[in-house]
Curated annotation (Swiss-Prot):
Entry function: Catalyzes the attachment of proline to tRNA(Pro) in a two-step reaction: proline is first activated by ATP to form Pro-AMP and then transferred to the acceptor end of tRNA(Pro).
This protein's name: Proline--tRNA ligase
Family matches, as HAMAP family: Pro_tRNA_synth_type3 (MF_01571)
EC number(s) reported in the record: 6.1.1.15
Leading EC class: ligase
Name of the gene: proS
Keyword Hydrolase listed: no
Record keywords: Aminoacyl-tRNA synthetase, ATP-binding, Cytoplasm, Ligase, Nucleotide-binding, Protein biosynthesis
Principal location class: cytoplasm
A matching Pfam family: tRNA-synt_2b
Species of provenance: Methanospirillum hungatei JF-1 (strain ATCC 27890 / DSM 864 / NBRC 100397 / JF-1)
Amino acid sequence: MEEQEGTLPQKADFSGWYNDILWRAEIMDVRYPVKGLYVWFPFGFGIRKRVYGILRELLDRDHEETLFPLLIPEPEFMKEAEHIKGFENEVYWVTHGGTTPLDIKLALRPTSETAIYPMYALWVRSHADLPIKVYQIVNTFRYETKHTRPLIRLREITSFKEAHTVHATWEDAERQVEDAIARYREFYDRLNIPVLISKRPDWDKFPGADYTIAVDTIMPDGRTLQIGTVHHLGDHFSKTFSIQYEDTKGQQQYCHQTCYGISERSIAALISMHGDDRGLMLPPEVAPVQIVIVPVIMKKREEEIMQAAELLEKELQNAGYRVKIDTRDLRPGAKYYYWEMRGVPLRLEIGPRDLDNGVVMGVLRSGGKESLPRADIIAEVNRKMTEFTAILQERAKTHIKDHLVMVKEESLVNEMVSKGVVAVHWCGNRECADRLEEIADASVLGTEVRTDLIDQTPGTCIICKKPESVVTLIGRSY
């Protein structure tokens, strides 16, 4: 790729920066000839593989991975009216097999409840069969009519992790919701992405759910991005699909269920939260290349320098690091540009003077050079990686703090929401919420906010002045 054609827009121009970095850093190619469908570059897919590796690790503690079909028969898909009402305008339908019209239309899954739950009705017989905890990572299809954007708003979601659990009681399902929230918080902690967790208002919950807990983060332009959801489904779907078990008294009972999902929006958040004007900045755990070694060649000592670089590479690889030596016939500056764009956490430079002094020059992607003793290189690299991770964490935390503000005057809501997420007191009345959304030109995101960044003490509703109103988040969203 000609990644050096022009320069990356400054991150202050977030839309331009985001669109450019996807191809300059070789994450996604947007030129596929169907709107809303994109192609993963190998480097971008390497990030995806490691991000979803963390997710698999967290879920595999007590979930089992599975795979259900992409195609859903229309009669099964249409069974749950409230659920389908939320998706019917977004469904792709398969109507022909070759040139032959199908007797029954088949939906390309927009989500998998109606594919999975008919099978659960066959699998569950007794209380001994419970709980069921499975997940799959699949592609889903939604006919988005809004403006599509890679990783954020797609017609093919290529990396949808959806978990579906079945329990004996509502309370068991509620405990599973809390477990899923904790799992997602741990996932985003490892990506160094601070999150805001809240309960969506009833009119914005998942179709067919008792309630929805959402995981949001704040993008560089102050808009929120929903990067995870957890839904308590109650016995709504089990009644529709006849998912029942025999309890210890021999009575038939309907099951209670949960589902929770994360998509490649997690990677959009990763890119956006940590990147800067020079490109990506990737946490070491998910960087396809963690360390790049750049030999600084002097012709008379080229062989000696290359041998030293190869020995260094092998030593670092044996310590568990993903390492590349850049041997391309390019100026050092061009190599630095290339690897900085791709967010490699640490660059090690080794030249004749470094050889003579028994050191390696270390440069973190966040900036700053340091001479590292060659004899202690593994310990030194470990230290630098820890330092880099701490820098990412602190920068991200500062960003969220700077874009989350408590507002107590109605007249200030619109001005402040243009800069980020606003916390207000809201009585829970839909009319007050509608008024809030009107004056803010934004959405009510949720209540029961789980963050220590704002005071959660109840107060007076910002609209109707009712006392003992709860803290609620307002924001403009992708």
